[in-house]
Amino acid sequence: MSRNATIALVQMDCVMLDKEANLQKAKTFIEQAAQQHADLICFPEMFSTGYSPALIGPKYIDVAEEPDGPTFCFLAELAKKYSMYIVAPIVLKSEIPGLLYNGLIVISRNGQLMGTYNKTHLWAGERFWFRAGDRYPVFHMDFGTVGLMICYDGGFPEVSRILALSGAELILCPSAFPIRDKDMWDTYFGSRSLENCCFVAGINRVGTEDDCYMFGNNKIYNYRGHLLAEAPVDEEFLLVQTVDLDDVAYHRATDVPYLQERRVETYQKLTEMY
């Protein structure tokens, strides 16, 4: 008995601060994913507004939404129509007026809000505009358990390890990754998948914002750190890959038991400030 899941990873350019245009483009990608029987679709970091803190930081407050705001309502109808889970990274309002999160919403196949994740490791100029998250939820879907992190989070092994220990069999990392760091992009997700014996995918923007060029090149790796599929560089693309999450449980139990054989009593240094 297998637990196959078909995952669609969206590599798209965004129109700065134009939610309507970006959501219409997202709809097209969702329709394409439905034609390929996708169970889940994930968009890149801040896909509905554009990313650049330098260019649009002061306007984040104007485009921020509640988790169940207009973007959710638009995507929820598509989730129901196509029976597809949707991971949508957007600017989220916090519980404190004026404080924002670089976050995401997760929508179920029947159009319900499953929850949110807020980026915990803020990069550079993000710190001036966003509050860092402080929790690492996992999402129980009908095919398995999914963990989420955003861009810079992927460089911290602790994040994916916590997600794996919480049961994640598939970890998704929507990003806005610049071309100058492509060597890191090519290393991040294979490392995280091998360390945690699970599937890991990077979902990147494509396009230019000011002097920041984002190159796409979505990737998905298996539980041994092997690259299963990748999208081209420099173009919009929908990468679709089917994975069997039963392979994760088998691999963790019988092949390389990294999670079971941790020596947590020796790891005190990990909780100390550097």
Model-derived regions, located:
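Extreme N-terminal starter segment of soluble prokaryotic enzymes
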Residues: 2-9
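Conserved beta-strand and immediately adjacent loop positions that scaffold enzyme active sites
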Residues: 6, 87, 103, 135, ...
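Short, glycine-anchored, charge-dense loop/turn motifs used at functional sites
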Residues: 7, 106-114, 221-228
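Cys-nucleophile CN-hydrolase/nitrilase-fold catalytic domain and related Cys-dependent amidase chemistry
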Residues: 19, 28-110, 178-195
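Short beta->alpha transition motifs characteristic of CBS
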Residues: 49, 105, 116-123, 219, ...
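Active-site catalytic loop in hydrolytic enzyme cores
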Residues: 65-67, 77, 95-169, 174, ...
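CN hydrolase (nitrilase-like) catalytic-core segments centered on the catalytic cysteine
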Residues: 67-87, 155-239
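C-terminal beta-strand edge segments of enzyme domains
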Residues: 138-140, 205-274
